[in-house]
Curated annotation (Swiss-Prot):
Protein species of origin: Citrobacter koseri (strain ATCC BAA-895 / CDC 4225-83 / SGSC4696)
Protein name: Cobalt transport protein CbiN
Pathway in which this enzyme or protein is active: Cofactor biosynthesis; adenosylcobalamin biosynthesis
GO cellular component, one term: plasma membrane
Pfam families for this protein: CbiN
Family to which this protein belongs: Belongs to the CbiN family.
Species lineage: Bacteria, Pseudomonadati, Pseudomonadota, Gammaproteobacteria, Enterobacterales
Role description: Part of the energy-coupling factor (ECF) transporter complex CbiMNOQ involved in cobalt import.
Membrane topology: Multi-pass membrane protein
Keyword terms: Cell inner membrane, Cell membrane, Cobalamin biosynthesis, Cobalt, Cobalt transport, Ion transport, Membrane, Transmembrane, Transmembrane helix, Transport
One GO term of the biological process aspect: cobalamin biosynthetic process
Compartment list: Cell inner membrane
Principal subcellular localization: membrane
Amino acid sequence: MKKTLILLAMVIALVILPFFIDHGGEFGGSDGEAESQIQVVAPHYEPWFQPLYEPASGEIESLLFTLQGSLGAAVIFYILGYSKGRQRRDDRA
C-alpha cells in the first residue's frame, strides 16, 4: 500500500511540476523546431521527401497522432499481459 502511494505521488508530481518550473513555456512540436533549425543551418535546403498523406487540419493530425499512440500502447500492454499470463500458467503446471 505504501509503495502504491509513493508511486502515485511521483506520477502526480511528474504531471504537475512542469507547469511550475517554466511559467512562460510554450508547448511546441519537434517538427516545427527542427524545421526552424534547418533554416538557420542550411537556408537553401529543399526537402527530398513529401508525406504520403497530409491531414486537412491540425485537429485531424492530432487525432491520428493520438490513435497511433493508443494503438502502440495497446500492443505493448497486450504483449505484457500475454507474457504475464503465460508465466502464471507455467508456474501452476
